[in-house]
């Protein structure tokens, strides 16, 4: 459900129906991908590397508790990490990120019925907050083995890009809320699309192209 929800969150009602993009939701335990081509969902893929895999890598390599490893991982982005631990944490995260980028490459290679893959990539989810993920996607040449027509551009999805949902609390501030907002949007949409003979896929495609 999550990749479809993220797709719905990005496209909205008034978005260009010819939208093509790769959407990635990096959660705690998995990474979910959805490929949108000309406004339709071409499929979704999932593999088991999320934010906790990076924490476990730090835990294992540095010989610390899971809680301490999580603090080190988060501290790397906020510059609140002991200087003596920085290199070890960076090395642990880098090794896991290299495996993760291999998972992205493998997942996208399975969309072999498309002539080419969309060059726009949008990330969301708490796991995507790690700077090293963006660095791997933007700095490596992993995409050259796949049918991209140009180097992909990578961005986080912003809450203000979610059509039809307005945050009046001021608390929804970044990409970590996008999946929940997308699920809310799909829940609202399903009340409007109630064709008894339609499959879930048909309903989702109708929502995406509305």
Language model region names:
Residues 5-12, 16, 20, 46-62, ...:
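Helical "lid/coupling" subdomains associated with nucleotide-phosphate turnover
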Residues 31-35:
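Short beta-strand scaffold segments in enzyme catalytic cores
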Residues 29-30, 109:
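Short, flexible segments with low predicted structural confidence
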Residues 5, 28-29:
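Short, glycine/acidic-enriched loop or turn micro-motifs at the edges of active sites
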Residues 41-42:
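Short hydrophobic beta-strand segments in globular cytosolic domains
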Residues 1-3:
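A short glycine-rich beta-strand->turn/loop micro-motif centered on a GG-aromatic cluster
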Residues 21-25:
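Short glycine-aspartate micro-motif
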């Amino acid at each position: 459900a999550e990749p479809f929800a993220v797709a719905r969150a990005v496209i909205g009602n008034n978005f260009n129906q010819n939208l093509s993009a790769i959407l990635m939701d990096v959660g705690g335990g998995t990474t979910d991908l959805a490929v949108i081509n000309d406004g339709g969902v071409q499929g979704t893929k999932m593999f088991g590397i999320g934010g906790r895999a990076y924490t476990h890598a730090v835990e294992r390599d540095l010989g610390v508790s899971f809680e301490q490893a999580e603090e080190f991982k988060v501290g790397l982005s906020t510059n609140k990490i002991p200087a003596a631990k920085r290199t070890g944490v960076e090395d642990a995260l880098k090794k896991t990120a290299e495996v993760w980028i291999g998972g992205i490459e493998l997942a996208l290679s399975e969309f072999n019925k498309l002539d080419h893959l969309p060059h726009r990539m949008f990330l969301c989810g708490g796991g995507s907050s790690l700077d090293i993920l963006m660095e791997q996607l933007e700095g490596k040449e992993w995409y050259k083995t796949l049918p991209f027509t140009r180097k992909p551009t990578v961005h986080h999805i912003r809450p203000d890009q979610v059509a039809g949902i307005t945050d009046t609390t001021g608390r929804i501030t970044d990409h970590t809320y996008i999946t929940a907002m997308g699920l809310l949007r799909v829940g609202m949409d399903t009340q409007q699309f109630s064709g008894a003979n339609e499959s879930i896929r048909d309903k989702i495609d109708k929502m995406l192209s509305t």
